[in-house]
């Protein structure tokens, strides 16, 4: 929407934007179709997948700053030097209205929604969606969702002073300050804003992938994360969740899925103390085989100083069906006379 509003003179100058999320790719792809030169400045912690896609779309990508605000300072310098047209990721009415078209399509398909959870970074998406939603249905509830690591809107909305962290799995919404234009709209139209834990975001990403076969990045999974933490989870009301963005590094995704298996005890590591004599490991492996439990890794140590010189410690990683299955194998190993502890990474 913003690109289409540019004059021919502005198009010839080329555009520049700072973003760690979907805004960058929207600009890059739009410029590719319209024949406009695009420069994108992204923070240092931007996933390689997002960087690569912008390059593939033909944009000139510059990595600068530890967050979007620092990236914006570099953008301003480049605008002054090269006279680029700056396209702000959220504090721009044309961008806000463009993002609001998402809600128009959403409510055309689901007109009876009573409540919608919307991810919040700088406030572009939620302000645009709120304008459309409230015009179509003034009774619909709009709830903004942020990670507790970046409570920008929450602090402005409720006049609190919650602290910020340096990183989040939802890097696409890692914004330290809500746009002025966005905040004005949000305070008028948004009903509530909530914060969610990083672990809930991880769980939401896993649920999207495993249940819906849909890859959603951290920022896009905020809505479902909020629903998981809310009492609304058990209600039968028509509730909507905006899932936006599917750019997640393969390494991060694999780590996230493994962490979710650990939370569910489908993968667990046990520390087992035993006498240092033949046949001990065999007893445990036979028990695992009988219970259809897969052994993923084994570490056998005779040099643990808190044990007797005639004892050994076995650290064994197992794959189970669920928590009930995991607890069963722990109890069965204890019945064999072994001292068992579950190793939990905090």
Q: PLM ranges: what are they?
A:
Residues 1-346:
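PLP-dependent amino-acid enzyme catalytic core
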